Design a protein with these regions (language model features):
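Hydrophobic/aromatic beta-strand elements that line small-molecule binding cavities or substrate pockets
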Residues: 8-10, 67-73, 96-105
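Short solvent-exposed loop/turn micro-motifs enriched in small/polar/acidic residues
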Residues: 3, 64, 94-96
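Hydrophobic alpha-helical core bundles mediating ligand binding, dimerization, or RNAP-core interactions
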Residues: 6, 23, 33, 86, ...
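Beta-strand/loop substructures that line and gate deep hydrophobic ligand-binding cavities in soluble
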Residues: 87-138
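Hydrophobic ligand-binding cavity/cleft-lining segments
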Residues: 1-45
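Glycine-rich portal/gate segments that line the openings of hydrophobic small-molecule binding cavities
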Residues: 40-92, 111, 142-154
């Protein structure tokens, strides 16, 4: 990994509003997560996400854990990003990565760009030297395929 950001993109047949509605509903995140680590939405996930929203997720990567996420970038139907930190005692050891979705209207649908930004992550240097960036890139590509299926199911 050369920089601190990995991005994947896909043109999804559907409007930016349709895609954004899915992204802004944290309770739906487990349905399109391509990594298999997002298990269940927790606190704060029942309301539509907006700038400053805080929501929790139950996760599992080997062992179960929880994350707390805060929406830090928001432009309705164009951009949503949240920063993740560990829940409980993990908040002191992990966190800071940003998950960002940019939506651009194009002919035939919406160009969706998902980015994993570790520039502020506490484990940035560890991640950069591991296989996690390559695994994350593959997982993000799967997530975009699942988002496409979800949008086109309506």
């Amino acid at each position: 990994m050369d920089g601190d950001v990995i991005s994947v993109e896909r043109v999804i047949p559907g409007s930016p509003g349709q895609v954004f509605d899915l992204l802004a509903d944290a309770s739906k995140h487990p349905t399109f997560d391509g990594s298999g680590t997002v298990k269940k939405a927790r606190s704060g996930a029942s309301e539509r996400l907006t700038l400053g929203s805080v929501f929790g997720m139950s996760m599992k990567l080997g062992l179960p854990y929880r994350t707390v996420n805060e929406v830090i970038e928001y432009d309705e139907n164009r951009l949503i990003a949240w920063q993740t930190r560990g829940g409980g005692l993990l908040k002191y050891a992990i966190g800071g990565r940003i998950w960002r979705y940019e939506l651009i209207p194009v002919q035939g649908g919406t160009l969706v760009r998902e980015s994993w930004d570790i520039s502020q992550d506490k484990l940035r240097l560890v991640f950069k030297r591991s296989s996690l960036p390559a695994m994350t890139e593959k997982s993000m590509a799967r997530s975009l395929k699942r988002i496409e299926r979800a949008v086109n199911a309506h």
